Amino acid sequence: MSIKKLNTIDADTLQSIPYEPLSFVVEDLLPQGLHLLAGAPKIGKSWLALWLCLCAAQGKPLWNFATKPCEVLYLCLEDSFQRIQSRLFDLTEDAPPSLHFAVMAEQLHSGLVEQIEQFLQEHPATGLVVIDTLQRIRAVGSEANPYASDYRDIGVLKALADRHRIAVLLIHHLRKLNDDDPMNMISGTTGLSGATDSNFVLRKSKRGENTATLYCTGRDIAYRELSLEFNNESHIWNLLSDSCEQTEQPNARIRCV
């Protein structure tokens, strides 16, 4: 039995390769790659995702973070075009043509990747794809190894994001049990959160409150906690504070490097 040789590269050669720098859709927050935004049902994840899509399509800042103008595809798989229209009017009177919506799509291993790649071919300026929700594109089955299934599914989407140098954001749910580490509350196995480039958890301390914390962690971003407040009139999550900007204490600075 022949063994395939490892494809290695020495450190000196690696340092001499002029790789293209990482591109950010939202500066310091959402780079190219695969990302997961999780929150409890009806907490306001979709409002946040829609506003993010608008900001990216218009090239307007998301809170204090600059965005890179790009075309955006938002797969709203739990909504209708009528509901999306209503929400758009709540957010803006001038929605850009660079923001695209779909309410139906194939499942992950049954044509979804091909559908997205066809869209990217027709819209080469696309920088962000949002899938709302992750569960809608996954087949229902009784996997013997849920971790392997989660990791495999996420791997397909990560490969898509890396291949086209775009950001793909998956909207997902939290498990009901509380945990001191918000990332442990992401529904599913660690095969989901472990295979993504970034994870975001939107969490309220009490269900009826308008305030929440967005916990942000990833391979290419600093860990930060964004305190947010939902405005019931504008339907926008407003930024109250950013843990990376609060204090000049050495420990806080190191935490955000």
Specify the residue positions occupied by each region the protein language model found:
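Conserved inter-motif catalytic segment of the P-loop NTP-binding fold
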Residues: 2-7, 12-14, 19-21, 25-26, ...
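Phosphate-binding/switch region of NTP-binding enzymes
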Residues: 21-24, 36-38, 42, 46-47, ...
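Pre-Walker A (Motif I) flank of P-loop NTPase domains
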Residues: 31-35, 70
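Hydrophobic positions on the alpha1 helix immediately C-terminal to the Walker A/P-loop
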Residues: 48, 52
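Gly/Ala-rich phosphate-binding loop of Rossmann-like dinucleotide-binding domains
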Residues: 57
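Conserved phosphate/pyrophosphate-binding and hydrolysis machinery centered on Walker-type P-loop NTPases
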Residues: 143-147, 186, 247-248
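Short alpha-helical segments that sit at the start of domains
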Residues: 238-257
